[in-house]
């Protein structure tokens, strides 16, 4: 209860802080907003358990940040990795790991910076993409990928940069399809409809990565991907709306298969036994 009150207080303080900054400088307000946008507001307190205690422990440096994770069945028949969502951890994907190990796969699962067991305070889509690329270069070639939410966005962004073919498999679970949608949602959270401040926010994104926020898009990246893609999304997802996913579905890409569920929402979908089995079988 105390934790929830503290979180509400922090959010209220941030809203006021950004509004005050915007009175004096749209740029400063945008800088603060982007900083908050890149920081997970919660971090899981889970510690390794069960199958994670049996794994090889992985620790390495990513852009000056120590990240930590696990590897099972080294030199397995095929390599797979798991990319968690915002404020989540690979510790939430035990069932996927067990299923992939039963198929004889080598499994690599590492918490992204600022998440779970890894160090760091912030991460953006560009950094998460580069994190996936580093995983592939360090432990790969990795041919099978599972990603939920934020992780589901960064997999296509990474794969379009990685040499790959039709043998690769990508399972996207409720991916954050359009970063522009995520940003719109964020501005609602901070209760801002300041157009000029939002324009400065967009300028900052371009300065950091050289591309506008619309570039960080599954619908854009998927056009450049040869891999087979299984895309699972729920009709009642209030975090990453199905409407964005349906625009991709309408394109009828031959390498993309959709599984649309109802009643699972954004989080329960990746925990659903039928979805897990479908994904493990696909990979």
Positions of predicted regions on the chain:
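Short beta-strand/loop motif that positions the catalytic acidic residue
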Residues: 225, 231-233, 237
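An N-terminal hydrophobic leader/cap segment in hydrolases
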Residues: 3-59
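Alpha/beta-hydrolase active-site loop
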Residues: 122-143
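Conserved alpha/beta-hydrolase
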Residues: 90, 97-119
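Catalytic histidine-centered segment of alpha/beta-hydrolase-like enzymes
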Residues: 264-274
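Short alpha-helix in the alpha/beta-hydrolase fold that links the catalytic acid
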Residues: 96, 227, 241-249
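Gly/Ala-rich beta-loop-alpha elbow adjacent to hydrolase catalytic centers
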Residues: 146-147, 151-155
């Amino acid at each position: 209860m105390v934790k929830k009150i503290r979180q509400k207080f922090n959010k209220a303080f941030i809203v006021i802080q950004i509004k005050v900054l915007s009175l004096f400088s749209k740029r400063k307000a945008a800088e603060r907003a982007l900083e908050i946008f890149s920081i997970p507001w919660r971090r899981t307190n889970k510690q390794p358990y069960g199958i994670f205690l049996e794994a090889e422990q992985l620790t390495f440096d990513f852009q000056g940040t120590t990240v930590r994770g696990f590897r099972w069945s080294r030199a397995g028949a095929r390599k797979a990795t798991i990319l968690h969502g915002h404020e989540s951890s690979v510790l939430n994907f035990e069932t996927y790991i067990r299923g992939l190990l039963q198929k004889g796969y080598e499994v690599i699962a590492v918490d992204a910076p600022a998440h779970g067991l890894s160090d760091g305070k912030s991460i953006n889509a560009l950094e998460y993409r580069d994190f996936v690329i580093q995983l592939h270069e360090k432990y790969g070639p990795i041919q099978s990928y599972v990603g939920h939410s934020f992780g589901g966005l960064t997999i296509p962004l990474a794969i379009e940069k990685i040499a790959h073919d039709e043998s690769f498999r990508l399972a996207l679970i409720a991916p954050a399809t359009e970063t522009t949608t995520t940003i719109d949602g964020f501005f609602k959270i901070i209760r801002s409809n300041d157009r000029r401040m939002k324009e400065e926010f967009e300028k900052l994104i371009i300065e950091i990565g050289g591309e506008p926020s619309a570039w960080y898009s599954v619908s854009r990246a998927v056009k450049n991907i040869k891999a087979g893609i299984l895309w699972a999304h729920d009709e009642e997802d209030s975090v990453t709306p199905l409407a964005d996913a349906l625009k991709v579905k309408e394109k009828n890409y031959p390498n993309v298969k959709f599984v649309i569920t109802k009643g699972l929402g954004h989080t329960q979908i990746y925990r659903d036994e039928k979805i897990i089995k479908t994904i493990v079988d696909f990979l």
